[in-house]
């Protein structure tokens, strides 16, 4: 397995490697540090002044620290890469050069607004065709939540994650959320028999989605500790569940916008990514 570890030297970015190391074995890790000097005044000439060397030294220090941490986690150091310019462009360009299996990112986000998905993380996820592991804080890496909705994307996420990560001895949950039919327009909720029928079909669909994912997870030798069907707003129910159960990692699927070669994160995925403090693995395959 080959991993691209994107780091700016911050504690949050290092948390991504720390947390991911609990799920990956014998992986080759390429640390990447992108020095974004776009914030400097246009009057500053990086080539003719001492700034360039200073920032190169910063990048080298960040990469040397990452190298040390890779060794501490028992992983294999690949290439140390430094780049200058837009962080997003630097990451995406490197992803095109090498066939990676996983991208690691720490997300600073907007903590004051309780939104954890930073602009760099968001753009990388939207443009990535490989799984992206987003980390916000150091976790215990014990409780894993698979979110399923019956779509090919959520099932494929479960399949790919179990092949990519070592989930042995982890506490595994599977959750599916059915929306409350009583929240439909008033004229549609007047017929109780119709509402009961809709609720029954939703439960059948959710049960099928959970059983499909569970069958695969157990097939690869893992144990599902709990499977839950909830009713309500899917994003909020997942967020609440993650907080209540102190989940360490959420596994979610995303689908490709084939016309633009980008991933389409639905409103549920987007809200979960922005509001949980657990790690999130977004799988696009």
Q: Predicted segment positions?
A:
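Small/aliphatic-rich secondary-structure junction motif
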Residues: 1-49, 143-196, 215-222
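Active-site-adjacent beta-strand anchor residues
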Residues: 6, 81, 106, 147, ...
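Gly/Ser-rich helix-loop-strand patches that form or flank binding pockets
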Residues: 92-140, 240-285
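Structural beta-alpha unit
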Residues: 49-54, 68-103, 215-250
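A short acidic, glycine-rich active-site loop
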Residues: 49-61, 193-208
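Short, conserved glycine- and acidic-residue-centered signature motifs
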Residues: 13, 59, 117-121, 154, ...
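Residue-level recognition of beta-strand->loop/alpha-helix junctions
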Residues: 33, 81-82, 176, 228-229, ...
């Amino acid at each position: 397995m080959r991993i691209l570890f994107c780091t700016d030297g911050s504690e949050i970015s290092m948390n991504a490697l720390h947390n991911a190391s609990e799920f990956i074995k014998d992986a080759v890790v390429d640390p990447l540090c992108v020095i974004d000097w776009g914030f400097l005044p246009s009057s500053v000439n990086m080539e003719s002044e001492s700034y360039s060397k200073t920032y190169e030294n910063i990048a080298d220090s960040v990469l040397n620290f990452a190298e040390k941490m890779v060794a501490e986690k028992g992983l294999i150091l690949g290439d140390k890469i430094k780049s200058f310019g837009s962080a997003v462009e630097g990451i995406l360009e490197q992803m095109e050069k090498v066939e990676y299996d996983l991208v690691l990112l720490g997300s600073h986000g907007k903590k004051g607004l309780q939104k954890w998905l930073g602009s760099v993380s968001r753009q990388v996820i939207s443009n990535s065709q490989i799984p992206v592991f987003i980390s916000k804080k150091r976790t215990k890496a014990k409780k894993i939540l698979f979110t399923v909705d019956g779509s090919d994307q959520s099932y494929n996420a479960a399949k790919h994650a179990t092949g990519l990560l070592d989930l042995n001895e982890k506490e595994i949950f599977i959750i599916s959320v059915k929306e409350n039919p009583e929240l439909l327009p008033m004229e549609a909720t007047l017929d109780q028999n119709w509402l009961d029928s809709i609720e029954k079909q939703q439960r059948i669909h959710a049960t099928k989605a959970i059983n499909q994912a569970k069958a695969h997870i157990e097939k690869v030798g893992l144990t599902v500790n709990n499977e839950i069907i909830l009713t309500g707003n899917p994003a909020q129910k997942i967020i609440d569940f993650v907080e209540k159960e102190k989940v360490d990692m959420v596994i979610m699927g995303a689908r490709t916008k084939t016309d633009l070669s980008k991933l389409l994160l639905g409103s549920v995925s987007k809200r979960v990514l922005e509001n949980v403090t657990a790690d999130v693995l977004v799988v696009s395959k």
